[in-house]
């Protein structure tokens, strides 16, 4: 039976709220390159004891410039959600794989401290705000000592921006000039950090530097839409068969300048009526020059299929929708709710697609569930992908995508670094943003925000514009953002309003230059 939007939304209520908060720690010895960071021990304390213990002390301040204690740091990190919002991890600076889970602890001298594995460099990630909203903070800690946390994060952003900015400059000098001006502000703020007289002043100046560097990063991410490959698609998701008007509206997003793609989410593959409706949808998409991406199974329902039922579903989809251009054989892999057989099911689906002559040459997509620290160390996205994706599956996978829900798992200024790490880890696949949503009723309990804390429409627009631009604007991008609630959000009067216009803006702005 064809599902309704309300039914699907209720099913996703449990899926999107799965946050396996854990307090267990896992440490892995790792070798990392020490970053060039201007940071000094202060207050008359020598670095020797910290160096021997591998301790990095971290300072943050409140809006008045007063140093915060550990509880104050946790309050900001979680946006008032308490322990459920404690999402810190120490990562390998190059791969962003987890070194230590939940490393932050209370310290008598500073706001917080971490023990660095082998006393070496590591990257601390946690949710942290600027005026733009919450991001996945990525603060490169060069070694033991005392630091302004915000300054470390600002330097990590600033030092990684130049190569991307040079690439933008070659195709859009006006956009690059705007980013350069913002970077000049960040550079001045970082220079001021080095002249601070005490930890509180340095942390306050670090906060100013992070604000400036974050603004430059977000502007750079949007400017990078000019770098999008000519064949990268602008995507939406159909969670039910659309009518003719909805299809026409959706395919218009590309505005004739970038190919549009629609992911179709099949509820009951054994329902002849629903399958016929999806065949008509694919025909209409093709007539308009758009692509059809079939989702084999939404992650929320994967565990409801035993091995036999799974194979039957996949066979019915492949036989019933052979005209599809691409197949998402695994959705939100790495999610802790998927069960132990998720990878095996995904591999069997990929084999079925590759083995059928009608679909053998189509694009095979695997979507990973993005989160860095909100769940266990094992489920952190890059750790999970490196450890759990078998070579046999990778050999038949063309695209690795991310599913991102910023209210549950902030990304923000961390987007470029995370996407770059994914691309570097899997050089044989193209990368994509294959699921994105913000502001839906079943996401509102997420403690974090981006774009605007009060105005859902502004927040949704900011999220769609930023992450679509960041995902499209890279050499091996396949597409973005495959907005999950597209049909619901485009309805007149929908809370938070539509996303079609902002996606069209990005598609037009990302015209290959």
Give the positions of each predicted feature.
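Substrate-binding cleft of secreted/luminal carbohydrate-active enzymes
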Residues: 432, 436, 449-511
């Amino acid at each position: 039976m064809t599902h309704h939007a309300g039914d699907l939304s209720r099913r996703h209520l449990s899926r999107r709220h799965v946050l396996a908060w854990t307090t267990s720690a896992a440490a892995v010895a790792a070798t990392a390159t020490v970053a060039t960071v201007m940071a000094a021990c202060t207050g008359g304390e020598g670095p020797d004891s910290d160096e021997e213990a591998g301790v990095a002390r971290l300072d943050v301040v409140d809006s008045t410039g007063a140093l915060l204690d550990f509880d104050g740091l946790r309050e900001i990190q979680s946006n008032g959600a308490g322990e459920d919002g404690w999402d810190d991890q120490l990562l390998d600076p190059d791969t962003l794989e987890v070194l230590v889970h939940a490393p932050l602890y209370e310290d008598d001298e500073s706001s917080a401290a971490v023990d660095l594995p082998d006393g070496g460099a590591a990257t601390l990630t946690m949710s942290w705000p600027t005026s733009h909203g919450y991001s996945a903070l990525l603060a490169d800690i060069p070694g033991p000592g005392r630091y302004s946390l915000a300054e470390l994060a600002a330097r990590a952003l600033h030092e990684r921006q130049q190569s991307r900015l040079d690439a933008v400059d070659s195709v859009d000098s006006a956009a690059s000039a705007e980013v350069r001006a913002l970077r000049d502000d960040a550079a001045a703020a970082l220079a001021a950090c080095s002249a601070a007289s005490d930890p509180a002043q340095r942390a306050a100046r670090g906060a100013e530097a992070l604000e400036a560097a974050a603004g430059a990063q977000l502007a750079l991410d949007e400017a990078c839409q000019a770098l999008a490959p000519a064949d990268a698609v602008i995507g939406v998701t159909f969670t039910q068969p659309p009518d003719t008007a909805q299809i026409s509206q959706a395919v218009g997003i590309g505005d004739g300048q970038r190919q549009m793609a629609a992911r179709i989410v099949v509820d009951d593959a054994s329902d002849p009526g629903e399958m016929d409706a999806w065949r008509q949808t694919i025909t209409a998409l093709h007539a308009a020059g758009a692509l059809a991406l079939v989702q084999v199974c939404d992650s929320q329902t994967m565990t409801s299929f035993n091995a036999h039922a799974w194979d039957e579903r996949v066979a019915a989809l492949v036989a019933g929708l052979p005209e599809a251009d691409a197949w998402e054989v695994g959705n939100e892999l790495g999610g802790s709710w998927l069960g132990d057989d998720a990878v095996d099911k995904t591999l069997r689906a990929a084999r079925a697609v590759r083995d059928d002559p009608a679909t053998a040459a189509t694009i095979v997509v695997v979507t990973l569930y993005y989160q860095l620290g909100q769940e266990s160390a094992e489920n952190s996205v890059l750790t999970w992908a490196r450890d759990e994706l078998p070579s046999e599956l990778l050999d038949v996978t063309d695209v690795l995508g991310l599913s991102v829900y910023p209210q549950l798992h902030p990304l923000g200024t961390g987007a470029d670094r995370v996407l770059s790490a994914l691309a570097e880890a899997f050089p044989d696949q193209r990368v994509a943003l294959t699921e994105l949503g913000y502001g839906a009723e079943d996401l509102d309990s997420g403690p974090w925000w981006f774009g605007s804390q009060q105005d859902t429409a502004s927040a949704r627009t900011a999220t769609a514009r930023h992450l679509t631009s960041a995902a499209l604007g890279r050499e091996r991008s396949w597409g973005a953002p495959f907005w999950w609630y597209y049909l619901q959000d485009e309805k007149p009067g929908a809370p938070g309003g539509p996303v079609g216009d902002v996606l069209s803006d990005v598609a037009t702005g990302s015209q290959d230059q």
